[in-house]
Amino acid sequence: MRLLIGSDDSGCIKELVANRGTNTSEQSALQPLHLEAHLERGLNAKAHQMLQISDNECLLARMSGDIELVSWSREPRGGEEDKPVFEVSSFQVMATLGGLLDGEKMQELHKRSQRRAASADRFVALFALPGQPQRYFAATMSGQFHFLALADGDLKLQKTFSVRGPVEFAQLYDLEETEKLVFAYGGEDNLIKLVEVSRDLEQLEQIWEAKNVKNDRLDLKVPIWPAALRFLQPAVSPASEGLNYQFIAVTRHSHLHFYQTTHGRKPFRSVDLLPNREPTTSLEVVGDVTPLGNVKSTSFEGFSIITTDTKKSILQFEPSGHLLGKFGGSDIKGFPSYIHVQGKYLVEGGLDRYVRVFELKNRNMLLKVFAGGKVSSVLLLDVSDVELPLSKKEKNKRRHKRVLDEDQEREEDNELWAQLDGSSKRRKSKPRLDG
């Protein structure tokens, strides 16, 4: 496997090459073939978001407010006696676009925040715009929606819109082609909103806003803090005419909300995921999904979700709230701040400074490597394993087996010839009967 790891350790990215079964916490297990730091920028420029845009390019969104276009080339390594052959990468920043964060706005937003310490502005989303080659979108916690273009090897800022912050997530609807780009966003004390952006990037318009759920049993207002959202396909038999969007959202208060815009502005169903209201911070879907993780279904069934709490748990639920299982179990020792479903795998990293890869179908851990610093983001570039040369013990074992196989084959041949020879002699000695 080949991974790029965004690490808080000196604000670098690290290239990891390792096979399934690698575990740096066990001396007897396989160890990484390659782990090397690149593009160090310091702790204040750690990579919050990473996006692969081609076979040898990615975008890095850094805490410094820069988005970098990074290219890499590879050359072989190894090949000595009993050493595996694999490729390692050299990285180069090809273009940089800066000044995309707004620290002053975050100071204003902190005045109405429940957080004890002020949060620095950061990137909360970075993805490619479907159907628009070399066009990208980045969202910030302060409420900046940036639209970027890659042209002639350079990054250009096409347009920036300001929305209400703080923004914990920004999700694009990509289940079908729409006349305008449709985004959902929300955050602390910031109800979920749907906005449309014209394809020419001239206008952003809010088209829908959620309402909070009813007060709790003590008639107290339920805190507003949506943390992540995924769209579904439009309802087949909508309750009313008009705007037809469906989505699910998790909140920092461990609720899973179900929305249909034709049903109203409040969630039509709400599920408590965790009994003690531990904060849930992320949302990934396991099932038939789009490149941006939206659900290719009109039904709120037939898929599962993965979320994290702020302690150490990665939990998989049915939409009903039934717990299917946990990833990592007691192996994870700190907040799993980053998770991402990619194909058949779940990639995880966080405060305990390990990066892990799990198999979705059984939640088995395939890889665990100490990254040296808190893991902020991960790209899984390749899932194939490097062919390892045989050890002397394995070579001797195979040689011994080959000798045994040859002896057995020779013995079987001798037995077969003996049987054939015996049959021939019996036919010759058998008296002929004249009619």
Curated annotation (Swiss-Prot):
Its main location: nucleus. It is found in: Nucleus, Nucleolus. Signal peptide: none annotated. The keyword Flavoprotein does not apply. GO terms for cellular component: nucleolus; preribosome, large subunit precursor. Residues 394-435 are annotated as: Disordered. Residues 406-415 have a biased composition (Acidic residues). GO terms for biological process: ribosomal large subunit biogenesis; rRNA processing. Residues 425-435 have a biased composition (Basic residues). It comes from the Eukaryota. Keywords: Nucleus, Ribosome biogenesis, rRNA processing. Belongs to the NSA1 family. Involved in the biogenesis of the 60S ribosomal subunit. PANTHER family: NOP SEVEN ASSOCIATED PROTEIN 1 (PTHR16038), WD REPEAT-CONTAINING PROTEIN 74 (PTHR16038:SF4). Component of the pre-66S ribosomal particle. This is Ribosome biogenesis protein NSA1. It comes from Eremothecium gossypii (strain ATCC 10895 / CBS 109.51 / FGSC 9923 / NRRL Y-1056) (Yeast). The gene is NSA1.
